[in-house]
């Protein structure tokens, strides 16, 4: 037994209970000279090798049969590069000693990470292939300040936590280690003795790729190259741009018919992207693609926030999909979930044995609706983890926008909680001040760092200023989903037309608050699940009336101020609710031309017409862009308004929400002349009754509705028509 190392230290190191392996392992100056120590379980012989010559400088003595070796290098006083020749099971291997390398994280990075102000923490934390002192390998870093010991385990060390214990940087709570020879494509995890003395295996919070469920290991892979957002993509996100979003769940848009298996990212690039382009959509919105263990969460309970799910392929396959969308002229929106995370033991929950990422009090840290945990936004490192993630998807994948899920659950402490189940903020209020500051900070940083990318909020309350700048007291989002408009209009449309006259305000109320936010009008995945029925099936009447109602509603929606969002399947009037375990009902479009084809053609024409006419999108958030012409004809359920562009060009939109055609319907207009019908949801092209106005109508100098000139139209039954004024 050597007198240079205490037996208790060796025992603790081998047992995995020693927190400072670099103080023991590697090369050290002692009174006897330079001593090299190594923990190499199952090794039988170890020599210190001079790399340049390959000469054996010293044989290390086995001080413990469990694999602890030590030896003094004669006639050497200064540290030098060395390798170890190790014999395992009769086979000699030449390795570089991980414990001869100095600290990995620079002092400035460590300080910024501790302060929570490192814009790109993913460039430092996680697993990064690197070359140090001429040696190729991978540097690993993980934040676990309360763990007693952390080791890297993986395919490079037989998943043995004794072999690669990490160095703790006490000033930041980060553990680090460079492992020579570990390379891209290998699986790894962190094995730790947590704050309570329990042995845990954890996935890397900053892993750039991960295994597909049910496996949970992280994957070493390089940081993706940055993607520059083009000027065209920036313009496509602006307030005056036409934005028509096709919301998609990649796992159920279409599946292989022979085995019901998912399409890959590359197959989706070849099928989904050209379809969305052909349909005239401007944006693809993807339900969360972060790695997640439970298919039924649709991705909204992510465990790998930095890793695209392997369900559909590799990280590079996903980048291929994004590139294909951009090449087709489609911007890509990613659903982003910074509001909560699942309780799975391999992920963030009680990461180092303490409530590291979540609040410790369940009244703050547990979401009973979803059985998930809530991030502690007041903890700087946690907020930094999330802000960095937002920047990561935009900078490294070319994502054009983030749609933030469940904002209301973040900004209200009493969200879905009864009295006594929540804790007021420091001022006694119900607002989650830390979450509000986190959202403002995220939006501010994205605006500064990736100008042109935007964020959208799914916020279900009337919290003021969601899409207003921070200096105005807002949250700083660019857009907000108008869930009130969605609920009101769907409630109206499901009524039998005979009762709609008593609920006329459900269609007009939206304009009373339209300019308080920058709204997106969403018919999202949430509206076609959990017994709500499909959008088509909510419409009243027989089959003909259901389809007519739906077409009229779409015509109304595409004309109403606000950007558009339609969940997949609704574009061809799928009749059943969405099922995430199966393909959309594409068979409805097989065979002869039918009502489903008609709705699909209508949505395509709506998109292309909406994009072509600036009046339909240029002034969504400016009162000049909208004017009621007929707002009070509730007895006949008729509504008529004007959309207007910056130059004053107008489009008239007229809707008749009863099955009774309205002949010779006169109303006042602003601009006399010939008005051409550019869209009629009752057209035979869409399988309607083909009532209309022969393609065009001339105005009369007959006063109506307080205006000198007027039009006399036929308003088709259960239909919306658009008219544009012909140039003189």
Curated annotation (Swiss-Prot):
Any matching Pfam family: CBM_48
One GO process term, biological-process aspect: glycogen biosynthetic process
Top-level EC class: transferase
Catalytic residues in the record: 405 (nucleophile), 458 (proton donor)
Transmembrane parts of this sequence: none
SUPFAM superfamilies: (Trans)glycosidases (SSF51445), E set domains (SSF81296), Glycosyl hydrolase domain (SSF51011)
Keyword Glycosyltransferase in record: yes
Its EC number(s): 2.4.1.18
Known pathway: Glycan biosynthesis; glycogen biosynthesis
Gene Ontology MF terms: 1,4-alpha-glucan branching enzyme activity; cation binding; hydrolase activity, hydrolyzing O-glycosyl compounds
Known partners and oligomeric status: Monomer.
Sequence similarity: Belongs to the glycosyl hydrolase 13 family. GlgB subfamily.
Name of this protein: 1,4-alpha-glucan branching enzyme GlgB
Native species: Escherichia coli O1:K1 / APEC
């Amino acid at each position: 037994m050597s007198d240079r190392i205490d037996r208790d230290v060796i025992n603790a190191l081998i047992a995995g209970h020693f927190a400072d392996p670099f103080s023991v392992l590697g090369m050290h100056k002692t009174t006897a000279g330079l001593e090299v120590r190594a923990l190499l379980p199952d090794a039988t012989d170890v020599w210190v090798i001079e790399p340049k010559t390959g000469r054996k400088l010293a044989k290390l003595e086995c001080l413990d049969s469990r694999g602890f070796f030590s030896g003094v290098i004669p006639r050497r006083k200064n540290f030098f590069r060395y390798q170890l020749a190790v014999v395992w099971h009769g086979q000699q291997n030449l390795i570089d000693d991980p414990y001869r390398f100095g600290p990995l994280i620079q002092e400035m990075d460590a300080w910024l990470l501790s302060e929570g102000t490192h814009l790109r923490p993913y460039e430092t934390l996680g697993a990064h292939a690197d070359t140090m002192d001429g040696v190729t390998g991978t540097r690993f870093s993980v934040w676990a300040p309360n763990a007693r010991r952390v080791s890297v385990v993986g395919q490079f060390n037989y998943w043995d936590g004794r072999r690669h214990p990490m160095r703790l940087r006490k000033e930041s709570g980060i553990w680090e280690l460079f492992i020579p020879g570990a390379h891209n494509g290998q699986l790894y995890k962190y094995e730790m003795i947590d704050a309570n003395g329990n042995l845990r295996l954890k996935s890397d919070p900053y892993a750039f790729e991960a295994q597909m469920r049910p496996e949970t290991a992280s994957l070493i892979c390089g940081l993706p190259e940055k993607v520059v957002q083009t000027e065209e993509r920036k313009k496509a996100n602006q307030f005056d741009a036409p934005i028509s979003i096709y919301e998609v769940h990649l796992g159920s848009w279409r599946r292989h018919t022979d085995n019901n298996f998912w399409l890959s990212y590359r197959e989706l690039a070849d099928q989904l992207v050209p379809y969305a382009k052909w349909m005239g959509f401007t944006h693809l919105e993807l339900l969360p693609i972060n790695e997640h263990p439970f298919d039924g969460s649709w991705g909204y309970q992510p465990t790998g926030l930095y890793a695209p799910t392997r369900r559909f392929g590799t990280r590079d396959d996903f980048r291929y999909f994004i590139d294909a969308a951009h090449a087709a002229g489609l911007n890509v929106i990613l659903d982003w979930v910074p509001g909560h995370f699942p309780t799975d033991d391999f992920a963030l929950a009680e990461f180092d044995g303490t409530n590291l990422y979540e609040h410790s009090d369940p009244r703050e840290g547990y979401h009973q609706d979803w059985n998930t945990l809530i991030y502690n936004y007041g903890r700087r490192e946690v907020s930094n983890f999330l802000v960095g993630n937002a920047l990561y998807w935009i900078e490294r994948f070319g994502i054009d926008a983030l749609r933030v899920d469940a904002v209301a659950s973040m900004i209200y402490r009493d969200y879905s909680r009864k009295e006594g189940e929540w804790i007021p903020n420091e001022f006694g209020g119900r607002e989650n001040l830390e979450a509000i500051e986190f959202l403002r900070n995220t939006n501010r940083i994205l605006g500064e760092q990736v100008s042109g990318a935007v964020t959208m909020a799914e916020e279900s309350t009337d919290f003021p200023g969601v899409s207003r700048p921070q200096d105005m007291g807002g949250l700083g989002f660019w857009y907000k989903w108008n869930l009130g408009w969605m609920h009101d209009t769907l409630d109206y449309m499901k009524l039998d037309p005979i009762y709609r006259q008593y609920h006329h305000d459900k269609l007009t109320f939206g304009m009373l608050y339209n300019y308080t936010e920058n709204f997106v009008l969403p018919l999202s995945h949430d509206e076609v699940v959990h017994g709500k029925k499909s959008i088509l099936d909510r419409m009243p009447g027989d089959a003909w009336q259901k389809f007519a109602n739906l077409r009229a509603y779409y015509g109304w929606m595409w004309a109403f101020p606000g950007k558009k969002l339609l969940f997949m399947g609704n574009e061809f009037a799928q009749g059943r609710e969405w099922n995430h375990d199966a393909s959309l009902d594409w068979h409805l479009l097989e065979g002869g031309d039918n009502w489903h084809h008609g709705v699909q053609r209508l949505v395509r024409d709506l998109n292309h017409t909406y994009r072509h006419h600036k009046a339909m999108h240029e002034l969504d958030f400016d009162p000049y862009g909208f004017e009621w012409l007929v707002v009070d004809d509730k007895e006949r359920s008729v509504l008529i308004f004007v959309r207007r562009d910056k130059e004053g060009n107008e489009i008239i939109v007229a809707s008749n929400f009863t099955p009774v055609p309205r002949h010779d319907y006169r109303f006042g207009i602003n601009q006399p002349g010939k008005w051409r019908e550019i869209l009629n949801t009752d057209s035979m092209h869409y399988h309607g009754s083909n009532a209309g106005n022969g393609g065009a109508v001339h105005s009369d100098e007959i006063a109506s509705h307080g205006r000198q000139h007027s039009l006399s139209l036929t308003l088709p039954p259960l239909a919306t028509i658009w008219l544009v004024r012909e140039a003189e």
